[in-house]
Amino acid sequence: MLILVSPAKTLDYETPASTQTFTMPALLEHSEALIKVCRELTPADIASLMKVSDKIAGLNAARFAEWHRDFNLDNAKQALFAFRGDVYTGLDADTLSEGSLARAQQHLRILSGLYGLLRPLDLMQAYRLEMGTKLANDRGANLYQFWGDIVTQEVNKALAEQGDDILVNLASNEYFKSVKPKQIQGQVITPIFKDKKNGQYKVISFFAKKARGMMVRYMLDNKVSRYEELLKFDTAGYYYSEADSSVNEPVFLREEQA
């Protein structure tokens, strides 16, 4: 199984990663092309384009200016340990065993507006460039047009190395739009997480994001390799609801949280 997740806006370059092992992103030439476009933006442009504060815009203008391809452990960090946010809280990478981390490197991929597709141990320099950003570039009006088929091709390459054809999509809609499902050489499974609130089960963003990370952790720790095993996910009170599910969209429910 190959697992896809989104990145996070929040980054942590202060806490040391739990390993010194690293790999390099596969699509850096494309990242470099995007950086050249981003360097032409003023902080005011960035604030408007990304809908962020002047402070965050200034920080990211500086990041674009300082970015260079000579990645090392002094100026970059492994992606899985650099991202913080609800998904990554659920995943809790800092406590992964050596075996689970090795499985993550093989079976987990992180979609990225700047880097396209990252393996967990791929080094990355700090950035903010969400996939939905309407950044005009030589290939089109936005990042979806910039990446075109490139991300999908990388996903298919990773799928081919899995030994099966199941892609577990735990990414947000914004990020999964960078993948072309009809071109995926396998079956796409998109788990749905619903929490009970006021007597109804519904997708609550904060809980759903965290649940995606918890499912990644469950799959890595339990060496999940078959669809049936995925349905046994039961972390934090979630349970599979066959009545609410389809084959490609298994639904996991949880009772109201106190």
UniProtKB/Swiss-Prot annotation:
- Which spans of this chain does the record mark as coiled coil? none
One Pfam family name is H2O2_YaaD
A biological process (GO) annotation for this entry? response to hydroperoxide
Family in the record: Belongs to the UPF0246 family.
Q: Which PANTHER family match?
A: PEROXIDE STRESS RESISTANCE PROTEIN YAAA, PEROXIDE STRESS RESPONSE PROTEIN YAAA
Tell me which HAMAP family the record gives.
UPF0246 (MF_00652)
Please identify the protein, giving its name as recorded.
UPF0246 protein Shew_1093
